[in-house]
């Protein structure tokens, strides 16, 4: 799904996977996930079908955001808990929409222009920022509401994109 902002000062593209993203987490103090599987997903992307992977470490736990293909490749562990919900990742892109281009300062204003209308409708989002782009994850079950809410401010184009 792609959205072009009418007043956002740039282009906002979103990428979603038909199967969505999963959010497994493991308590940091008892994490026994096999590092081999995580290293494969994170660094050996040519050896995996996973196209979206994020690992976040906090003092309390490790959180992994991974697409369905990557989720199936994760090692099993009794210490790994998985969120029941499936999330769709929307990618915020400014300007020409190239994933490899560097983003200008003020990207958060574009992300805010997407998040604010969703918050006004009580639609939950999960924000993930990287150096080059911002991802807004929405619950798969909320997609019709997200589309309806954003269609008043954005032109929505459906597409399948690769990361």
From Swiss-Prot:
Coiled coil: none
Gene3D superfamilies found in the cross-reference section: VC0802-like (3.30.2130.10)
An annotated GO BP: negative regulation of TORC1 signaling
Cross-referenced SUPFAM superfamilies: ACT-like
Pfam families: ACT_7, Castor1_N
Cellular component terms per the entry's GO annotation: cytosol
Family from the record: Belongs to the GATS family.
Protein name (record): Putative protein CASTOR3P
Organism field: Homo sapiens
Biological classification of the source: Eukaryota, Metazoa, Chordata, Craniata, Vertebrata
């Amino acid at each position: 799904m792609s959205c072009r902002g009418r007043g956002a000062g740039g282009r906002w593209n979103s990428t979603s996977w038909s199967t969505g993203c999963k959010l497994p987490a493991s308590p940091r103090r008892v994490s026994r996930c096999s590092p081999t599987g995580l290293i494969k997903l994170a660094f050996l992307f040519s050896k995996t079908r996973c196209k979206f992977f994020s690992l976040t470490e906090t003092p309390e736990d490790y959180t992994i955001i991974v697409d369905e293909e990557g989720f199936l490749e994760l090692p099993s562990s009794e210490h790994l808990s998985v969120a029941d919900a499936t999330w769709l990742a929307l990618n915020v892109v400014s300007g020409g929409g190239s994933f490899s281009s560097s983003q200008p300062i003020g990207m958060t204003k574009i992300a805010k222009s997407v998040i604010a209308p969703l918050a006004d409708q009580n639609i939950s989002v999960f924000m993930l920022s990287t150096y080059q782009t911002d991802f807004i994850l929405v619950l798969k079950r909320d997609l019709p509401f997200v589309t309806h809410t954003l269609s008043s401010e954005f032109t929505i184009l459906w597409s399948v994109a690769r990361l």
